[in-house]
Amino acid sequence: MSLPNPAELLPRMASDLRAHLAERGIERPRYVGIHTGGIWVAEALLKALGNEEPLGTLDVSFYRDDFTRNGLHPQVRPSALPFEIDGQHLVLVDDVLMSGRTIRAALNELFDYGRPASVTLVCLLDLNARELPIRPDVVGQTLSLGRDERVKLVGPAPLALERKVLSPAS
C-alpha cells in the first residue's frame, strides 16, 4: 500500500472543514496545531482556506500519559496561544491520529488555558488504531497499518509521509 500525498489531501480537507464549520454556524474559529506535524498541516490548511489568522501551537510533551514509559521528547517547546481560549471555537490540527493519546493530551492542555466553546478535530491521517474514543471531524485519509508499522509526516515543505517499520525489541 502506498501512502497518500499530503498536497493532494489538503484541498479536500479544507473544503470539508469549511463545510463542517458552516454546518455548525461557526465563524472565525481559532486554529491550534500540535507540534510538529500538526503545525505544518494547520499552516497548509490556513493557506488553502485563505485565512491569515494567527496559529496557536501546542507541545503536549508534559501532558502525555505515557511519557514516564517513553521518556520526555528531547526537544520540548513552549506552547503558544496568541488568543483567548475561553468561549472560542477551536480547530485542533494534528498530522496522524493513532492511539488518541496525543489528542487527549492536547485537550487537557487547552482546558488548562480556558474553556473553549467547541473543538473541531482535524487530522491528515487516521490510522484506525485508537485506544481512546477520539475521532476526527475532518480527516484526509484513513489507513490501517500492521502492528509494527508507523507513519511520520516530514516537512515542512514539501509535506510528505514516510512509512516506518519498528524493529523487534532485543
From Swiss-Prot:
Matches recorded under Gene3D superfamilies: 3.40.50.2020
* Gene Ontology MF terms in the entry: uracil phosphoribosyltransferase activity
Top EC class per UniProt?
transferase
Keywords attached to this Swiss-Prot or TrEMBL record, sorted alphabetically, are: Glycosyltransferase, Transcription, Transcription regulation, Transferase
Give the reactions, separated by semicolons, that this protein catalyses: UMP + diphosphate = 5-phospho-alpha-D-ribose 1-diphosphate + uracil
Q: Which residues cross the membrane?
A: none
Pfam families in the record = Pribosyltran
Where does this chain carry the motif PRPP-binding? 90-102
Domain of life, source organism: Bacteria
CDD domains in the record, alphabetically?
PRTases_typeI
EC no. given is 2.4.2.9
Biological process (GO), any one = regulation of DNA-templated transcription
Q: Record's family? A: Belongs to the purine/pyrimidine phosphoribosyltransferase family. PyrR subfamily.
Q: List, alphabetically, the HAMAP family matched.
A: PyrR (MF_01219)
Q: What does this chain do?
A: Regulates the transcription of the pyrimidine nucleotide (pyr) operon in response to exogenous pyrimidines. Also displays a weak uracil phosphoribosyltransferase activity which is not physiologically significant.
What is the name of this protein? Answer: Bifunctional protein PyrR
Q: Which organism is it from?
A: Pseudomonas paraeruginosa (strain DSM 24068 / PA7)
